[in-house]
Amino acid sequence: MKNKPLFIAIMAVVLASSVYAQAPTIELVHVQGGEFLMGCTEKHSDCSVNEAPAHPVKLNGYYIAKYEVTQELWMFVMGGKNPSKIIGDSLPVTRVSWYDVTTFVSKLNQLTGKKYRLPTEAEWEYAARGGNHSKNYKYSGSNDLEEVAWFRNNSDDEPHTVGTKKPNELGIYDMSGNVYEWCSDGFDFYEWNSSEPLENPTGYNLSETKVYRGGCMTSYPDVCRVSARNQSIPNAQFNYVGFRLAMDENPE
């Protein structure tokens, strides 16, 4: 067969398209680029040291997932393997390390031909605040945590189906509570003291720890604030940490 390599290549594309057609839906929300004050301001009494100083940040536009990555999507991409302790297709996947997530994203991109990634910490916070539609809530979407989050007061210490609480100003769910979410950044303390905005920051790449954000089902309210920060070594797996996807506005 003279055109056997071409035939194989075409079949590979067809099969990949077929597999992608069966994949669980990934809904993305467009976040318009803009400038915001990142970190905890003096008007809040429950700031942690690692949230200060508040500093101006300017971001390009991007996309971020409406929901946390579910166990259904994880198993589809990873061949049926589910690391989560509490099982349910529509529950957020947990017990995934930062390294596990990078493997998942690579496989997902191979399956779909797209360029998904983790959000940066700045992108995560800007989206959690509601982007350029922000109403400056303490939590993502409300000053009343019960409205928008599963946390220690209402969760029975278990993760819940994604998207069952009220969304924030951009229509994004669960950015406060349910499960923490890995970001792409290495952790570092804020040291930006200029009045000029820091543009598209990506964190400290040489850091031994990675950032995760948002609070979880066992968290106290202060940890679910949009400015609250956490960190861990990238090979750590927790029952309360998952992630959500992001994508450049114009992926090349």
What name fits each language-model region?
Residues M1-I8:
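Bacterial N-terminal signal peptides that target proteins for export
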Residues I8-A16:
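Bacterial N-terminal signal peptides
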Residues Q22-Q32:
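GGW-centered surface loops in extracellular recognition modules
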Residues V31, F36-M38, I64, V93, ...:
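Bulky hydrophobic/aromatic "packing anchor" residues in well-ordered structure
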